[in-house]
Amino acid sequence: MSKSLIVSSPGKTILFGEHAVVYGATALAAAVSLRSYCKLQTTNNNEIVIVMSDIGTERRWNLQSLPWQHVTVENVQHPASSPNLDLLQGLGELLKNEENGLIHSAMLCTLYLFTSLSSPSQGCTLTISSQVPLGAGLGSSATISVVVATSLLLAFGNIEPPSSNSLQNNKALALIEAWSFLGECCIHGTPSGIDNAVATNGGLIAFRKATAHQSAMKEFLKPKDTLSVMITDTKQPKSTKKLVQGVFELKERLPTVIDSIIDAIDGISKSAVLALTSESDKNSSAKKLGEFIVLNQKLLECLGVSHYSIDRVLQATKSIGWTKLTGAGGGGCTITLLTPECKEEEFKLCKESLLAHKNSIYDVQLGGPGVSVVTDSDSFFPQYESDFDFKKLNLLSKFNKYYI
């Protein structure tokens, strides 16, 4: 068993297909270069320690206090399709005095995976840190689930670190995705599975849900080039549930009109997949994607899910690129693809304008690699661990070892 290892995985953004995907349209998600990290250290102490270093929180439990009697995992290589409700209830009792909802969710997810994948006789410390902003629709909870699941699968010998054996790597990725989905269920109840799929595999994922007229689809794609984009967090709170309900009610009132909009968004998503995976000229591809972004945003406005905070970002960024909301809308985040002609001075002025309105800005690359692993058998691990401990997360990517 490795005594110390660090795992990371990327957040995600929805490029095209928001809301329409609920009704069977194709949507396109991409990994972003903001990553979450988990350091696992095995210890001789008879306890599990979980540290959320970004918010200065630490929780610890004696191993014997965990509800091992509810663990029913017969074979880690064949995870269940849904979480063990008795185990969830037992862990919920352990966390009943945890008042902070964010901490409660993270601890429940981590403890569920720990009890399912570890041993009652092996102490561990799990330290979690993240560049992915919470509650911004960028898949922060999925990244946590993926890094915790991967760390435990590695530490207890159920998968191997990345190697030149692609078959072994693919098997490991499938197992990580399956277990991280169960971790996501602890947080979100009934997640789509897309966030943890992107956080595991990276790249792009085109997906659609099953309907009476079509089967479900999930296709992993590798773009010709990574795309540099700007994500703007408007900090405007929103209710995804209310926004989805609003589109449903609009569709009930105007079915023919809204069905046409959904079909148009489906066409945009499919066209974007072709542009990203087959377009040879990067500038030509960017301009084509820019047109799709503008069209998709207009159609989302027709569905009533935009917001004045998003409009403000659209206005501020129109001279430097193409912008649309990403995720549920109603505030939240936008994504801006810069034009090939964008000048540094224009970009700087735009960012200053957005920051003046209390937005947060993230310069990211889309379509990059998925989960990565560095272990204490790697010669550079001491430096990597030091950078992690001092939260120099931006320095770590050059060392990461990826499954894909």
UniProtKB/Swiss-Prot annotation:
Task: State the top-level EC class.
Answer: transferase
Residues that bind Mg(2+): S141, E184
For this UniProt record, the keywords arranged alphabetically read as follows:
ATP-binding, Cytoplasm, Kinase, Lipid biosynthesis, Lipid metabolism, Magnesium, Metal-binding, Nucleotide-binding, Nucleus, Steroid biosynthesis, Steroid metabolism, Sterol biosynthesis, Sterol metabolism, Transferase
Q: What is its EC number?
A: 2.7.1.36
Q: Which co-factors does it depend on?
A: Mg(2+)
Family membership, please give it. Answer: Belongs to the GHMP kinase family. Mevalonate kinase subfamily.
The record ties this protein, via NCBIfam families, to: mevalon_kin (TIGR00549)
* Name of the protein: Mevalonate kinase
Q: Which organism is it from?
A: Schizosaccharomyces pombe (strain 972 / ATCC 24843) (Fission yeast)
